[in-house]
Swiss-Prot record:
Methylated by PrmC. Methylation increases the termination efficiency of RF2. Belongs to the prokaryotic/mitochondrial release factor family. This is Peptide chain release factor 2. GO terms for biological process: viral translational frameshifting.
Length: 367
């Protein structure tokens, strides 16, 4: 192995070792290691299953802790071993070992970058599950079909990330597609990953609904908000609520329309309306709708605070919550994020849920 390549290998190992130590401090490795031991001990106690919800919460916490603790432990051990091996290999001019270490260092780089990416999740709500609201804009059938395409895109994205996705509500279009839909996405940092998807998404294509093959432009809005838990205080006055029940519509089997199981809650002070129809039980739909309402109220408060902050900081971007964020020009094979200028030519791959290039760029640029 040539000298320059050897020097680069040594420099990379030194750099990664420093970054690994910095991550241990930033991610509080010692405290997480201790907490993981406590959680494991609790989960080993058979009595934990007397409270299934607590057991499930601990299971999720365990996975979150392991993602950090085990990765850093393996990374630290691997880097230490490689540093020792590279000294011996250099002394013996053992090129085969040096090349093997190079492959290991590539893996270390990937793990480091994954952990460092987590540092971008500074919002207290980033680790939470989230809801995604999709609303067709003006444009009739074309816009409603676009809304259904976006719904599929986010369901595919959730599948790619290993998240659980559930359609809570969908209002069918007049001819095709959807007027609106709400999905719940559960997974670690689901809100952190998806929050920058909030905004207006523009589609340009030759419409399949136009017999002349004309080029059409349509819009749909996406709004992402976190599922708040008990650690977030959200006060809701029952006197401010109007609760309506109705028969669910859309797919759901032969029993779905026989009872008024769907629930719609209107919060008078804010004008927020939420609805849920995914369960046959009115009680469960009502509980889910209340959770959605609290989450929307929390996000509304966060948005109001951000708006006030932006008024004080002239250097902030002028991209607002309702502004266009991404343009999907299918007949030119081009999808472009208007905030980060990231552009992808493989449009089908994006529509199949590969949103990582857009999301990562948005988070890195602090959109």
């Amino acid at each position: 192995m040539e000298a320059e390549r050897q020097n680069q290998l040594v420099a990379r190992l030194e750099d990664y070792a420093e970054r690994e130590q910095a991550l241990r401090r930033y991610l509080d490795y010692d405290a997480k290691s201790e907490r993981l031991q406590v959680v494991n001990a609790e989960l080993e106690d058979p009595a934990i299953w007397n409270d299934p919800k607590h057991a499930q919460d601990l299971g999720r916490e365990k996975k979150s802790l392991e993602d950090v603790v085990e990765t850093l432990t393996e990374l630290g051990s691997g880097l230490a071993d490689s540093c020792e091996l590279v000294e011996l290999a250099l002394a013996d001019s053992d090129d085969a070992t040096l090349e093997a270490i190079e492959h290991d260092v590539d893996r270390f780089q990937e793990k480091l970058e994954t952990l460092e990416f987590r540092r971008m999740f500074a919002n207290p709500a980033d680790p939470l599950n989230c809801f995604v609201d999709i609303q067709a804009g003006a444009g009739g059938t074309e816009a409603q079909d676009w809304a259904s395409m976006l719904l599929r895109q986010y369901l595919k994205y959730a599948e790619r990330k290993g998240f659980k996705a559930e359609i809570l509500e969908e209002s069918e279009g007049d001819v095709a597609g959807l007027k609106s839909a709400t999905i719940k996405i559960e997974g670690e940092y689901a809100f952190g990953y998806l929050r920058t998807e909030t905004g207006v998404h523009r589609l340009v294509r030759k419409s399949p609904f136009d017999s002349s093959g004309g080029r059409h432009t349509s819009f749909a809005s996406v709004f992402v908000y976190p599922e708040v838990d008990e650690s977030f205080e959200v006060e809701v006055n029952p006197a401010d609520l109007r609760i309506d029940t109705y028969r669910a519509s859309g797919a759901g089997g032969q029993h779905i329309n026989k009872t008024d199981s769907a629930v719609r809650i209107t919060h008078a002070p804010s004008g927020i309306v939420v609805q849920c129809q995914n369960d046959r039980s009115q009680h469960r739909n009502r509980a889910e709708a209340m959770q959605m309402l609290k989450s929307k109220l929390y996000e509304l408060e966060m948005r109001n605070r951000m708006t006030e902050q932006q008024k004080l900081e002239d250097s902030k971007t002028d991209v607002g919550w309702g502004h266009q964020i991404r343009s999907y020009v299918l007949d030119q094979s081009r999808i472009k994020d208007l905030r980060t200028n990231v552009e992808i030519s493989n449009t089908q791959k994006v529509l199949d849920g590969d949103l990582d290039p857009f999301i990562q760029a948005s988070l890195k640029q602090g959109v």
